[in-house]
């Protein structure tokens, strides 16, 4: 029902809880629902058992990537941790994308993290959650553009409305953030993301999709196709 009438033909389901059981459930849902084209799940990347877990889960063709909720880690250096990075270094062998979930203040450490893995494919989620409700853009924009210099990083356009209060959920207020993202990554490294169902605290799926379509309506049809499906198909090997 959520995507009916939107023209959306397929989605990627992304983890929310950091338990393997949720990854199992997402993979089961993908196998039973044709519109789910892939899963970004959670696995304990810092675990000593991560090699065997990756061997097991990567055998499931629905698994396209993994994500850790780094934004929720109390240790600001977590993303630079030895064990965590050992787990990240194994993903390329299994052709898995790593989705980066952080707050904007974690961008500097994220740049250092990405630099340790030049051959790993990364997708930055929610444009690194800038402080839209505070109308702050400079520091986030500077760090985002620095991260974007790493061509193995793409960026998911999502999560913006939940970072803004009701006054900043208009296209006009969000436009500078869209402009920064398109300047940093270009159409070839941007992906549309809904952040559903989290987005529902601020807007509906269809409303968010319509807003993003309107913002990028001035791009060529080929560029819009890249953002709304071609990049996802290529990056996640759908």
Q: Each PLM stretch: what is its role?
A:
Residues 18-105, 112-114, 156-160, 167-168:
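Active-site gating/metal-coordination segments in enzymes
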Residues 1-10, 179-180, 184-191, 200-238:
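Mid-to-C-terminal alpha-helical segments outside catalytic/metal-binding sites
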Residues 11, 26, 39, 66, ...:
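Conserved, mostly hydrophobic/aromatic
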Residues 16, 43, 127, 195-196:
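Active-site metal-binding loops of divalent metal-dependent hydrolases
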Residues 46, 82-83, 87, 123, ...:
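A generic "structured core" feature
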